[in-house]
Amino acid sequence: MQQNDIQLAIIGLGYVGLPLAVEFGRKRKVLGFDIRKERIDQLKNGYDQTLELTQEELQTSFNLTYTTDTEDLRHCNCYIITVPTPIDAHNRPNLQPLLLASETVARALKPGDIVIYESTVYPGATEEDCVPVLETFSGLKFNQDFFCGYSPERINPGDKTHRVNNIKKITSGSTPETAQRVDRLYQEIITAGTHLAESIKVAEAAKVIENTQRDINIALINELAIILNRMGIDTEAVLNAAGSKWNFLPFRPGLVGGHCVGVDPYYLAHKAQAIGYHPEIILAGRRLNNSMGSHVAAQLVIAMTKRRIHVENARILIMGLTFKENCTDVRNTRVVDIVTELKQFNCKVDVYDPWVIEGEAQLYYGISPIADPSPGSYDAIIVAVAHDQFKSMGVNAIRNLGKTESIVYDLKYVLCAEESDLRL
């Protein structure tokens, strides 16, 4: 297959697939496929509900077409799969979306085709889990009739600076020739350059440790924040002082959620356990980060008690629900842990987040965010997500939402140290 002969399809048009499809659509013909008809209809009308891409950006992708029809995939010969890889209720990898996408592609596979995976997985998943599905439903043989590549996504939702094209891309292939083809394909759109890995397993491992390393580093800072808070020392001041040394890593405490950093370590841990090794640090980091919602709720209740604010039936406003700032994604947000804990104390909790897509919080968590918080109504306010709207409000506007003796708990350093009552 020559470069000019590639007929490209992107499978899954979410936070990863859509920006990728748009970039390729500026260079070559691309078919964007998603099983969600509502999503395809919105994109055809120039609207991206994730707000990652504007209508103008979508319109500049002249060669991109959208479909939900699997028959359209038969006209393609190179498929990039970008579906989610979540975990189940027991924190075990859930490969079902990936395997179903593989089955869909397999039914369209022809001799000479290439299937590239971008979804984050544990090392070995592409060749050990996905390839058998491709072989079974296509009737073709791996590395004889069809070939595979792996190029892990590095999307950073809500970040308008680091985009698909200016983030260096890891590439790999199931044969040396396939690896070169995959690398050349991505070079069409990646201005930051590519890194051709030695194997698919190397590329898979590289991706999963990127997020595992970040998770562990945040866990360390979260633990330090708990210790420093007990000593009455401001964590941000300590981090700023330590950061004056050139090799100190600039991590901040906080809730760790979303579909990457809070999930991927479990994939690596799962594989480690499958080969007979119990990972200590990886799972310890996960436990600590998952406990932060309970910690925040407990600290707030203690502060309210000290101020003689009656906890039961207290009205509490949580500002922000998405897993990170300036992003619509509520999947695996750990803000819900705070909501759950406070409701255990019979607090009346309102959640306010202008970024949340209507109906999604109710669908995932049974939470209905309020449209606008009422001034002077709350006994406590938690600034949980650093949306630009919240930063621009300033301390007076935020405090005016509370009663006279209300407590402001700033989890994200949106306010100065002296402007809040509690911080991480």
Description of each model-found segment:
Residues 1-424:
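Structural/interface elements that position substrates and couple domains in central-metabolism enzymes
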